[in-house]
């Protein structure tokens, strides 16, 4: 559905600079046509403004004069996302509860829920109003799913798992599988029962094939508005705060506490029973073996402060040459020692 730029500006609370026109969609600066909106969030792409054919560009005031028609924003990337939502069509075409889904008689479904074929909702589970469960979703007994949640195909909530309002679970997510708890004995490795639960706050998004394990006792928790990427492993009894960004292939071992506003880049590994403070940033492939106070930026394995990590990155490519030079110096030193001994 086409919308006038003036309408978009009003809906988004942005300033329109330029001629009003109908807009039919959203695209990149390179590909956008006269009936599409684009955006500039990263300054390194500023050069693309000169040749874009976009009907309008969402930009900061600094770049508004670089295009014939601008929607002026203090956060172009965020407002691009809001614009995209206005033009995009949500996935799925069904509504209501399919006859081919299994809904236990003791389960409770809120108003306006959609449950696709082959979903399973167990006894005493409660599904909030307007939530959508795609095919293959498993919601075990005593689970709680908040209002307005999206559970994509084959998402699994094991017994007792709770998620808040507005959560998104992508395909293959598993919440509440047993934590990795075992004891070595004289008669083999024995399983420690995992009898706790998992609880997600409101507006949490969990990427495809991520696993968040149930606690041994108590609750494994993820705070409001935290976003977790694909293929992440969160161990039993982890307590994660609000507004965290956890990128793909991160592994967080059991009983670690993660504060609010923490960012972990791809493939970070965190040992168990640690404390990661508020506002901590961990660079890609960081290996965290000790607790980190609030506000630190760290990288490397083992993780060190940012300044040390950056110096290490600078030195590492030079190591082969340095090794040769040191070897040469050692030989020269030995020759000098021999000469000195003869004197």
Swiss-Prot record:
Reaction catalysis annotation: a UDP-3-O-[(3R)-3-hydroxyacyl]-alpha-D-glucosamine + a (3R)-hydroxyacyl-[ACP] = a UDP-2-N,3-O-bis[(3R)-3-hydroxyacyl]-alpha-D-glucosamine + holo-[ACP] + H(+)
Keyword Acetylation attached: no
Pathway info: Bacterial outer membrane biogenesis; LPS lipid A biosynthesis
One function term, GO molecular function aspect: N-acyltransferase activity
Keyword Lipid metabolism among record annotations: yes
GO cellular component: membrane
GO biological process terms, semicolon-separated: lipid A biosynthetic process
Binding partners and assembly: Homotrimer.
PANTHER family, per database record: UDP-3-O-ACYLGLUCOSAMINE N-ACYLTRANSFERASE (PTHR43378), UDP-3-O-ACYLGLUCOSAMINE N-ACYLTRANSFERASE 1, MITOCHONDRIAL-RELATED (PTHR43378:SF2)
UniProt name for this protein: UDP-3-O-acylglucosamine N-acyltransferase
Lineage per the UniProt record: Bacteria, Pseudomonadati, Thermodesulfobacteriota, Desulfovibrionia, Desulfovibrionales
Gene that produces this protein: lpxD
């Amino acid at each position: 559905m086409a919308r006038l730029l003036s309408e978009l500006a009003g809906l988004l609370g942005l300033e329109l600079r330029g001629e009003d026109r109908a807009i039919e969609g959203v695209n990149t600066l390179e590909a956008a046509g006269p009936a599409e909106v684009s955006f500039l969030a990263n300054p390194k792409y500023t050069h693309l403004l000169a040749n874009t054919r976009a009907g309008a560009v969402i930009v900061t005031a600094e770049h508004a004069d670089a295009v014939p028609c601008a929607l002026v924003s203090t956060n172009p990337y965020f407002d691009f996302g809001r614009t995209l939502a206005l033009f995009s069509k949500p996935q799925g075409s069904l509504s209501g509860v399919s006859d081919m889904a299994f809904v236990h008689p003791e389960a409770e479904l809120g108003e306006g829920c959609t449950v696709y074929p082959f979903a399973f909702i167990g006894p005493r589970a409660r599904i909030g109003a307007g939530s959508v469960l795609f095919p293959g979703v498993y919601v075990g007994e005593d689970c709680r799913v908040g209002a307005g949640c999206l559970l994509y195909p084959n998402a699994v909530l094991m017994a007792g798992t709770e998620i808040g309002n507005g959560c998104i679970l992508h395909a293959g997510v598993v919440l509440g599988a047993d934590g990795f708890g075992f004891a070595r004995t004289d008669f083999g490795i024995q399983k420690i029962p995992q009898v706790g639960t998992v609880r997600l706050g409101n507006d949490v998004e969990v990427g495809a094939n991520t696993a968040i394990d149930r606690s041994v006792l108590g609750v494994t928790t993820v705070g409001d508005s935290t976003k977790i990427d694909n293929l992440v492993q969160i161990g039993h009894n982890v307590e994660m705060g609000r507004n965290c960004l956890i990128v793909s292939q991160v592994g967080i071992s059991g009983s670690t506490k993660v504060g609010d506003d923490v960012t972990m880049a791809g493939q970070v590994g965190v040992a168990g029973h640690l404390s990661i403070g508020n506002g901590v940033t961990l660079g890609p492939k960081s290996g965290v073996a000790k607790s980190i106070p609030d506000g630190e930026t760290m990288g490397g394995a083992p993780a060190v402060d940012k300044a040390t990590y950056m110096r290490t990155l600078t030195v590492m490519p030079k190591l082969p040459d340095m090794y040769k030079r040191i070897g040469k110096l050692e030989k020269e030193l030995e020759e000098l020692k021999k000469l000195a001994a003869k004197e």
